[in-house]
Amino acid sequence: MGITIENVSKSFGSFQAVKQVDLDIASGSLVALLGPSGSGKSTLLRLIAGLEMPDTGRILLTGKDATYQSVQERNIGFVFQHYALFKHMTVRQNIAFGLELRKVPRAKINARVAELLELVQLTGLGDRYPSQLSGGQRQRVALARALAVEPKVLLLDEPFGALDAKVRKELRAWLRRLHDDVHVTTVFVTHDQEEAMEVADQIVVMNKGQVEQVGTPAEIYDHPASPFVMSFIGPVNVLRSRVFQQSEGTAAHCDIFLRPRDIIIETRPNGNTVSARIHRIIHLGWEIQVELRLDDGQELMAHLSRERFDELHLEPQQQVFIKPREAKSFPLYYSI
């Protein structure tokens, strides 16, 4: 099922949570709504679900106006951050709950539950209670329950936010595989850039109730549409108030954005390098973070592979020379 959002706005009192959002979500895609707290991503998800009604605009499902349809009429599955499982029911009973409400024949319920237990890799755990499961297993039960009624759209509101880092990473890979198997249109909310980049086909970056950019993970990272997107998607250095001479001879102030991995460090001057001094070296395991201070006092962060770091023999307080491998500039900057 494709989703079309046309000029949708939603306010709560004087606070405008969603501002004139236009968005197309292709049928069968896996889309991340990504942004900081207060960006409007969860409100937009609830508008798609029918849990909130927009003040203005329309929401279309497969081309049909569903703006004021109920959740039941939309046939949407919704999974919250905190599982919301029935504690007094077994895993099997939790998954079957929606099917029983719809009075599906018992034989079909049993077959569907068995199919879903296998799909979410919980075969053999159907008779356990939620308290006997790990956090990751509980979230998989919640996903199975949402999928049981064969929804046309699956909505996930920060589904892994309450889990520890290792489990989150495992479930991200699992969710991607699950989506490839079931092909249901899926929209999930996250503030975790890595999670969005790893899982989604398309990322919708939101800020202050508006959509900043829509694109594939590669497009969002390599071609950010605004300073906000550049700053929010991964670590970035900002060199402020650099002056560039324009063709007509006037000057313009630009901020230069540099990814830490795009800073080249040399131990000797080489071409258009700039002098800097190493302030601190942090070993991250898979790479080395080098904190630098320019002669004018501005601070930068560079990431080096372990191999390159070992080649350079860098130490704190050492003078080095840096240059960008790639940089982006924007005429105006606003913070996240």
UniProtKB/Swiss-Prot annotation:
InterPro entries: AAA+_ATPase, ABC_SmlMolc_Importer, ABC_transporter-like_ATP-bd, ABC_transporter-like_CS, Mo/tungstate-bd_C_term_dom, P-loop_NTPase, Sulph_transpt1, Transp-assoc_OB_typ1. Residues 3-233 form the ABC transporter domain. SUPFAM superfamilies: MOP-like, P-loop containing nucleoside triphosphate hydrolases. ATP binds at residues 35-42. The keyword Ribonucleoprotein does not apply. GO terms for molecular function: ABC-type sulfate transporter activity; ABC-type thiosulfate transporter activity; ATP binding; ATP hydrolysis activity. Gene3D superfamilies: 2.40.50.100, P-loop containing nucleotide triphosphate hydrolases (3.40.50.300). Signal peptide: none annotated. Part of the ABC transporter complex CysAWTP involved in sulfate/thiosulfate import. Responsible for energy coupling to the transport system. The complex is composed of two ATP-binding proteins (CysA), two transmembrane proteins (CysT and CysW) and a solute-binding protein (CysP). Belongs to the ABC transporter superfamily. Sulfate/tungstate importer (TC 3.A.1.6) family. This is Sulfate/thiosulfate import ATP-binding protein CysA. It comes from Thermosynechococcus vestitus (strain NIES-2133 / IAM M-273 / BP-1).
